[in-house]
Amino acid sequence: MQKIGIYPGTFDPVTNGHIDIIHRSSELFEKLIVAVAHSSAKNPMFSLKERLEMIQLATKSFKNVECIAFEGLLANLAKEYHCRVLVRGLRVVSDFEYELQMGYANKSLNHELETLYFMPTLQNAFISSSIVRSIIAHKGDASHLVPKEIYPFISKV
């Protein structure tokens, strides 16, 4: 059976921090699924279609990465793909508190599921999609925070 990991997120937009985690975690799995969440409750800046297209462009050089859109429970998605490991990033203490709760909730729904947490590399530690959206909203230049392939998307906003 293939070793599969799932890296879920809203990716609104995808950042260099996300790509760093995709790069490092893709080396641990035969296949890494990047699952773009619908997340209507978060009121995303970019549509699901745009977010999926951005992440596909940004990961096209990764041979073992597949990008999908999903809605519903992550634990169910993991079962569907026969995945036993979720990949998550942790930047700050508040991320840890939230991610720990989510990890336990997912484990309670799918007992075979484990969560693997990645700390960002130093140069990406401060980057978040929220910061990128704020810079964009104030007409600033966020090109150094996102993959070059997606800059045309965010420069239109």
From Swiss-Prot:
Name the site position(s) for Transition state stabilizer: 18
Pfam families with a match to the protein in the record: CTP_transf_like (PF01467)
Residues that span the membrane, as ranges: none
Binding site residues for substrate: 10, 42, 74, 88
Pathway where it operates: Cofactor biosynthesis; coenzyme A biosynthesis; CoA from (R)-pantothenate: step 4/5
Xref: InterPro entries:
Cyt_trans-like, PPAT, Rossmann-like_a/b/a_fold
Q: Which GO terms describe its molecular function?
A: ATP binding; pantetheine-phosphate adenylyltransferase activity
Instruction: Give, as one word, the top-level EC class.
Output: transferase
| Function in brief | Reversibly transfers an adenylyl group from ATP to 4'-phosphopantetheine, yielding dephospho-CoA (dPCoA) and pyrophosphate.
- Can you tell me which family this protein belongs to? Belongs to the bacterial CoaD family.
Name under which the protein is recorded: Phosphopantetheine adenylyltransferase
Q: Which gene encodes it?
A: coaD
